[in-house]
Amino acid sequence: ISTTSFFPAKPLGCYGDGGAVFTDNDEWASIINSLKVHGKGSFKYDNVRIGMNSRLDTLQAAILQVKFRAFIDYELTDINKAAVEYTERLKGIVKTPIIPDGFYSSWAQYTIKLKDKEQRDELQTYLKEQGIPAMVYYPNPMHLQTAYKDLGYQKGDFPITEKLCNCVLSLPMHPYITTAEIEKVIDTIAKYLKG
């Protein structure tokens, strides 16, 4: 089973909210289809489980159909070229994402790893002062979020996750980013860190 989000900021986003679930298991597909339509059973007005209204509306589906063509035709290639530019120019300055040979990414974010939270936060502030947006998307690890409190996890149970939440920063990234924009981001990071 796999999922994807069609949130507008995602690489393949619609103009509203949306997502998809993929499976090659017929039983799971049946349950997922039921859950997305209020928990519907085999009879339209018999809800056999608690579900939700999460069908993708036809307008969003039409938008995605057009965007999917652009995504396949050039956006995926362009965003991977941008990632290569970032990675090559940031070598030796910060830790960059690693994509194994034979794979590629759709790059929802290009996230760098810094020394610690203090350095990350200071760099983010400096980039903002220079007119460069940089984001911390996941400041709190999942195991420490309120929704999972009943699982009994404590701070320190997942030290790598906790460290990453404190030291990663996402840089501007989209298929239409220019080499000049990437160079400005990299030069600004290098200037700050080599300060």
Model regions and ranges:
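Adenylate-forming
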Residues: 14-18, 62-64
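Conserved active-site segment immediately N-terminal to the catalytic lysine
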Residues: 1-13, 43-46
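Short beta-strand-to-turn element immediately C-terminal to the catalytic PLP-Schiff-base lysine
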Residues: 5, 19-24
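Short, glycine/charged-enriched secondary-structure capping and boundary segments
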Residues: 17-19, 185-186
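Alpha-helical hydrophobic/aromatic positions enriched in membrane-embedded helices and signal peptides
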Residues: 9, 16-17, 49, 164
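PLP-dependent aminotransferase class I/II
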Residues: 24-195
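Short glycine-enriched loop/turn motifs at secondary-structure junctions
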Residues: 12-16, 104-106
